[in-house]
Structures are given as structure tokens and as C-alpha cells.
Swiss-Prot record:
InterPro entries per UniProt: Ribosome_recyc_fac (IPR002661), Ribosome_recyc_fac_dom (IPR023584), RRF_sf (IPR036191)
Keyword Protein biosynthesis: yes
Chief location: cytoplasm
CDD domains named among the record's database cross-references: RRF
The family this protein is said to belong to: Belongs to the RRF family.
Name recorded for this polypeptide: Ribosome-recycling factor
Gene giving rise to this polypeptide: frr
Assigned keywords, A-Z: Cytoplasm, Protein biosynthesis
MF annotations from Gene Ontology: ribosomal large subunit binding
Keyword Protein biosynthesis among UniProt keywords: yes
Length: 186
């Protein structure tokens, strides 16, 4: 491994941490409906647990209602039960072949819980990013010890990795501010 490899690996892993945070934040319910809250609902499909998006079309009907239309008519009841059992606080209602999923407005208390959850997810992402920095710095020290790079190269690479860390931590903070604003908007 070279100094450039260590930097590239750290960058890729930090980027992955940001992607994971974005995915986690998408699961957090806000006052508005969005199809992302149903992304992880699993449906029993011919005996196999299958992602809801594989067996139904999920769309927004309006700001507070999600529409779920199973591809097969016989799946309507199964999909409705899966959404109800997903522990998302949602109460789907079937209208013919379409399942309407109204998202109730969040109470003030629930909004504050969601903000805490968002901050917790962000802190986990920051910890992951810092751990990646630590691993990269240890790799650089090992390269220096093995005489694969000079002290100047190691110092320069550490500075660049620190800049990467700062950049990604700033991005985490930005994502959190956006999500908090979204959660607290009534």
C-alpha cells in the first residue's frame, strides 16, 4: 500500500459513511409523507420475505398520503398487513387495488424524539469518520516504519486526511441541520 492508496481508501470509506447516514436519515419520519419510510418494509411473497418496492408501486398521492399499488391483486391484503406490522406508526387503508397510507402529523414530543434520533445517527457517522481517519493514520505510520515513505510524505498525507475528515464531518453537520429543519417544520 502506498500513501496515495491510504488517502484514497480513507476518502472512499468516509464517502460510504455519508451514504449510510443519508440512508439512515431517510428512514426518519417527518411530518410530510415520503416514499422512503416504506423502503425497508418486507412483504411475504410466495414464501420469501421480499422488499415492498419489489412487489408494489409506491408513490406520493399528496403531502400527507403515500399510495401503494401491488403489482398483483392478491397481494393487496398481504402488503397492507406488512405495512401495518412494520412498526412505523402508520395505518394503511385499502381502496380497491390501491392502498392509501396516510402519515399522521407528528406531535411536538415525537418531533423532539426524532431530532434526538437524527443527532444520534449523525454522531455515529462522525465516530465512523474519525475511526477511518485513525486507521488511515495508523497505515501511514506503518508505511513510515517500513520505510515505504518519508516523514514529510507521512506528515503531508496526515494533513490531507485531516482535511478530508473535516470536510466529511462538515457534510454530516449540514445533513443534520437540513433533517432537523425538515422534522421540526409543522
Amino acid at each position: 500500500m502506498t500513501v496515495a492508496d491510504a488517502k484514497k481508501t480513507a476518502d472512499q470509506k468516509m464517502q460510504k459513511s455519508i451514504e449510510t447516514l443519508k440512508a439512515d436519515l431517510a428512514k426518519v419520519r417527518t411530518g410530510r409523507a415520503h416514499t422512503g419510510i416504506l423502503d425497508h418494509v418486507m412483504v411475504e411473497y410466495y414464501g420469501n420475505p421480499t422488499n415492498l418496492t419489489q412487489v408494489a408501486n409506491v408513490t406520493l398521492i399528496d403531502a400527507r398520503t403515500i399510495g401503494v399499488q401491488p403489482f398483483e391483486k392478491k397481494m393487496v391484503a398481504v402488503v397492507e398487513k406488512a405495512i401495518r406490522d412494520a412498526d412505523l406508526g402508520l395505518n394503511p387503508a385499502t381502496q380497491g387495488e390501491m392502498i392509501r397510507v396516510p402519515t399522521p402529523p407528528l406531535t411536538e414530543e415525537r418531533r423532539k424524539e426524532m431530532v434526538k434520533l437524527v443527532k444520534s445517527e449523525a454522531e455515529d457517522a462522525k465516530i465512523a469518520i474519525r475511526n477511518i481517519r485513525r486507521d488511515a493514520n495508523e497505515t501511514l505510520k506503518k508505511l513510515l516504519k517500513d520505510k515505504a515513505c518519508s516523514e514529510d510524505d507521512e506528515r503531508r498525507a496526515q494533513d490531507e486526511i485531516q482535511k478530508l475528515t473535516d470536510k466529511f464531518v462538515l457534510e454530516v453537520d449540514k445533513l443534520v441541520v437540513e433533517k432537523e429543519k425538515e422534522v421540526l417544520t409543522v
